[in-house]
Amino acid sequence: MSSQADIIKPDSRIVVQFSCGAASAVAGKLALAQYGDTHDVQFLNAYLANEHQDNRRFLADCEVWTGRKITVLRDEKYGADVLNVFRRERYMKGRTGASCTKLLKRRLLDTWKRPGDVMVLGFTAEEEHRLDDFRERNPDRPVIAPLIERGLGKEDCKAIIARTGIELPAMYRLGYEKESAA
């Protein structure tokens, strides 16, 4: 595996994949702290029509916390709607992942990326296998995972957000592990 020094070049954009969850918020804040003075750090969000409306409040709160505008991208083909993807594609999850993630998030984000971009993913210490799977499926896509690098788990991220005074998204308060269906 390459080191960050091998992955991140002086002209790389650092692109945070912001999902409106605690982990991606903390991963983005850590990336901004580490690279904000030397690189163009961008925050991107793929809007989902089916997500809880409180995610937009959390996104706005995180814009204030990070001091950065979060660019929101919206799929047009499927209306940013997970159910439309399932109806048209006729599967939920295959060997390469969930169809909604691929079509409503990854493909959309791919249209925005530039060569040399380094993705920041909010995989937590408990999700190292997801990072390994991602790297295996995307060997040409440079990616860093600040939470795994620092041994931070889901509960750590929730606690960090709580200490900022930002209220966690409603889906957490309703008892779900994540802010989305993914």
What are these regions (language model features)?
Residues 1-182:
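Nucleotide-activated chemistry modules centered on ATP-dependent adenylation/adenylyltransferase
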